[in-house]
């Protein structure tokens, strides 16, 4: 059963690790699909953080759009997939790294991870995607 707009947006606000899919830059390859942290607030854009020169960063820049899919298996099987165009790519800030890390890590791990990532991951960008196409389902009724 498809989710309502409110249900799918609420599910996307939860801290699931997403599967990001984007057209590969190599012509003879399937889409690049990788796990990624993301941030979303209902009615807004989805944003991700990645390396400026990472494979996914380059692929997203070339394609101009990408897809995220999040799912769960309990208490019911549910997924939400959202796809759309990139609306901005900007240099990442330490504050954004803290926000994203706080979403996924236990509070006592955030500072250490942020210090490590800020020093070791190289130049990062924040990519904003405007949700344009949604797919969703929950198998609660099955």
What are these regions (language model features)?
Residues 54-56, 75:
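Short, surface-exposed beta-strand-loop junctions and turns on beta-sheet-rich folds
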Residues 15-52, 60, 66-70, 79-82:
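Short beta-strand segments
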Residues 16-17, 65, 109, 134:
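Generic structural signal for secondary-structure transition and capping sites
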Residues 22-24, 71-75, 108-116:
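A short, aromatic/hydrophobic, helix- or strand-capping loop or linear motif
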Residues 2-3, 79-142:
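Charged, gly/pro-rich active-site loop segments
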Residues 9-10, 38, 58, 117-119:
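Short secondary-structure boundary/capping segments
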Residues 1-16, 76:
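Extreme N-terminal tail/first-helix region
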């Amino acid at each position: 059963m498809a989710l309502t707009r409110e249900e799918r947006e609420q599910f996307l606000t939860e801290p699931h690790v997403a599967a990001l899919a984007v057209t590969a830059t190599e012509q003879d390859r399937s889409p690049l699909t990788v796990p990624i942290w993301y941030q979303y607030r209902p009615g807004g854009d989805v944003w991700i953080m990645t390396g400026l020169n990472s494979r996914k960063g380059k692929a997203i820049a070339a394609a101009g759009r990408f897809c995220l899919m999040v799912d769960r298996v309990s208490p019911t099987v549910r997924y939400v997939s959202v796809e759309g165009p990139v609306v901005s790519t900007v240099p990442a800030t330490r504050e954004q790294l803290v926000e994203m890390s706080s979403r996924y890590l236990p509070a006592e791990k955030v500072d250490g991870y942020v210090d490590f990532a800020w020093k070791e991951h190289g130049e990062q960008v924040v990519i904003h995607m405007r949700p344009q196409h949604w797919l969703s389902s929950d198998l609660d009724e099955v």
